Amino acid sequence: MDINTDKYKNITRNLEREMINLNPIQRGGILPTESKKIIYEYWDGYSVCDYCSGRLDQIETPPINEFLEDMSKFLGMDITRPTHGARESKYAVMNSICKEGDYVVLDGNAHYTSYVALERAKLNYEKTDIEEYPTFRVIPESYAEKIDMLEDSKKNIGLILLTHVDGNYGNVADVEKVGKIAKSKGYPFLLNCAYSAGRMPIDGKKLNVDFIAASGHKSMAASGPCGLLSINKKYENEVLETSKVNVLKELQMLGCTSRGIPILSLMASFEHLIERVKKWDLELEKTRKVVNELEPLGFKQIGEKPRNHDIIRFETPILDEIAEKDKRRGFFFYEELKKRGIGGIRRGVTKEFKMSVYGLTNTQVDYVINSMKSIINELR
Ligand SMILES: Cc1ncc(COP(=O)(O)O)c(C=O)c1O
């Protein structure tokens, strides 16, 4: 076999370490230095399995079993399992509690992974309404309407799914209202917390949710791929059913999920998560400051206002205007930010972009604001 492996010898991430990364999908997954030191010992394949006696969630060394119990407390749920991401968590719920052909009633801002999960589980869906431009908020009452409509036409509803914070606008949905509707109608309720758990405080019990899908690499300062599924005890038997052949192994987990660095990194970052969610108000202050400072430049923030989450989506007609006359065309903004050590804004975009300053220091936030101001004021 003639395979040239030279190209794998110097794989680098091609990202200057000092760069300030504004990509919302990446800000919540940055590991604190302490976690980086801990995972150094765990880079071998099945590194957490040295003392396994049959199942990942029961491993005592390293203390995965205790970590999962503590994580349940952190999320206000009863039982937690590691997964490879929020999408795998959603799929595990759908595949276990719904029957083929059932309907999932989900919000109009649901992520594509909710759709691929339900398609893979051979389910149908009904999408609820959202507000129009520019807020695009989920309308909780629409859940009741869609449920009534499906019931009237004798369709079987298997699950109610809500995206806690959507990735397009960063709107925080009214979970309590949707939870009340799901409960009063008697349907199980799954909350997709990919963009919330680990960034902001979550209490599943208070929110009336039956399942939480969380994402380690997106919002829990963990190496990807990694996630969590937290469930209400009531659903333990269905969701965590074990194999008839190997009675210890859970079917939806295909026996065991995260078997190395990802789960270990999540454990190593747990203390950091506990501390950082306490500072959510400060994150919102920084986010709102960015919006207030940048809108006068000719940006328009889309989604609910003021911001209740760190994702910021701006419409940017001013960048479009500059791109018309700049010889770098649409790439000027990316290039100018890069010169200033700022990355994470998509290359070539001028009509709108998304950003987040989650976890940056106040000095870094001011630097980002001033950099954008100076780019636009110099080139307009
Ligand atoms: C709202 C939302 N849910 C789920 C996901 C997927 O998360 P994961 O990669 O953990 O499956 C994303 C990723 O962008 C997301 O924005």
From Swiss-Prot:
Q: Which UniProt keywords apply?
A: Protein biosynthesis, Pyridoxal phosphate, Transferase
TM annotation in the entry: none
GO BP terms in the entry: translation
- List the molecular function annotations (GO) for this entry: Sep-tRNA:Cys-tRNA synthase activity
What EC number(s) has UniProt assigned to this enzyme?
2.5.1.73
Q: Which cofactor does it need?
A: pyridoxal 5'-phosphate
Which residues are listed for pyridoxal 5'-phosphate binding in this entry? A86, R87, N192, S215, G216, H217
Q: Which reaction does it catalyse?
A: O-phospho-L-seryl-tRNA(Cys) + hydrogen sulfide + H(+) = L-cysteinyl-tRNA(Cys) + phosphate
| InterPro entries per UniProt | PyrdxlP-dep_Trfase (IPR015424), PyrdxlP-dep_Trfase_major (IPR015421), PyrdxlP-dep_Trfase_small (IPR015422), Sep_Cys-tRNA_synth_arc (IPR013375), SepSecS/SepCysS (IPR008829)
SUPFAM superfamilies referenced in this protein's UniProt entry, alphabetically: PLP-dependent transferases (SSF53383)
> Which residues are recorded as modified (N6-(pyridoxal phosphate)lysine)?
K218
Q: Does the keyword Protein transport apply?
A: no
Query: Pfam families in the record, alphabetically?
Result: SepSecS
Q: Member of which family?
A: Belongs to the SepCysS family.
- Function of the molecule: Converts O-phospho-L-seryl-tRNA(Cys) (Sep-tRNA(Cys)) to L-cysteinyl-tRNA(Cys) (Cys-tRNA(Cys)).
What quaternary structure, including any partners, is listed in this protein's UniProt entry? Homodimer. Interacts with SepRS.
Instruction: Report the protein name in the record.
Output: O-phospho-L-seryl-tRNA:Cys-tRNA synthase
